[in-house]
């Protein structure tokens, strides 16, 4: 499973996930060159890489995903983080992502959308 954490997530979460699973391919959109990408371009890039987006953007990202799907395009997969998980609660987010990765890390995530439970 390859993950991209969006700019709304603590970049330290990527390090925590890598410590938990040394072979997990995790990037943060805060890395140089990535933060400037528009959401549609980010989804296109992630589709090409087969990388799943983990995002807190529940306002505009669902519409971008829908637009891609309606155009017959795929995406790498999206995991939405609900607002009920506080932005400062990295520990809870790490726990929820850990549960999901353990349960479904080997699944095909192409064009799949998932909401983490709080």
Which functions belong to the PLM regions below?
Residues 39, 45-66:
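Acidic, metal-binding active-site segment of PIN/NYN-like and related structure-specific nucleases
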């Amino acid at each position: 499973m390859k993950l991209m954490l969006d700019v709304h997530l603590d970049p330290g979460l990527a390090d925590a996930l890598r410590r938990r699973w040394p072979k997990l391919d995790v990037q943060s959109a805060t890395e140089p060159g990535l933060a400037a990408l528009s959401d549609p371009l980010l989804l296109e890039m992630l589709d090409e890489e087969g990388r799943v987006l983990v995002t807190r953007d529940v306002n505009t990202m669902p519409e971008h995903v829908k637009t891609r799907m309606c155009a017959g395009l795929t995406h790498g997969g999206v995991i939405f983080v609900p607002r009920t998980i506080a932005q400062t609660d990295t520990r809870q987010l790490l726990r929820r992502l850990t549960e999901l990765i353990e349960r479904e890390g080997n699944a095909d995530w192409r064009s799949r959308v998932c909401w983490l439970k709080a």
